[in-house]
Regions:
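Beta-propeller-forming repeat regions
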Residues: 1-139
Length: 139
């Protein structure tokens, strides 16, 4: 058990500090691997009541801006916007928030390569339709 606090419905693994070890993202907390005892905050947030839901359903780790550092995509409560946080490339830097996609409507989106180009798309419901959103890799 990493924490007794309820901060997310789901978590993600990926090397966020480029030390060769997987790190874990759960809610607004980054647990640095391999021991997962050193933590950093990705954004402001508070723990949630375990009898309720959090506003952080899924996270995905991928280099979204092409700088070779993994960033974090966060899918919040169903119907909320998906956002991503740019990796500051330092252990104490601020993770800047960016809009990824408006109104992700289901509880089980995924971030996977659908078109075979080696880059993931966000597969989700949006306005009662199933589809996917592509990252604009030129920006």
């Amino acid at each position: 058990q990493l924490s007794s606090r309820f901060v997310a419905e789901g978590a993600a693994l990926g090397d966020l500090d480029r030390d060769g070890h997987c790190d874990l993202v759960a809610g607004n907390v980054l647990y640095r691997g391999p021991a997962f005892t050193d933590t950093r905050r990705l954004y402001d947030g508070q723990p949630f009541d375990p009898a309720s839901y959090s506003d952080h359903f899924f996270a995905f780790v991928h280099d979204l801006d092409g700088d070779t550092w993994n960033d974090v995509v966060v899918i919040g409560f169903p119907g909320q916007d998906a956002v991503w946080y740019r990796n500051p490339r330092t252990t104490d830097g601020a993770w800047t928030k960016h809009l990824a996609f408006r109104g992700v409507d289901n509880e089980s989106p995924t971030f996977t390569d659908l078109d075979g180009d080696g880059r993931p798309e966000l597969v989700c419901m949006h306005e009662d339709r199933l589809g996917y959103a592509k990252v604009d890799w030129q920006q």
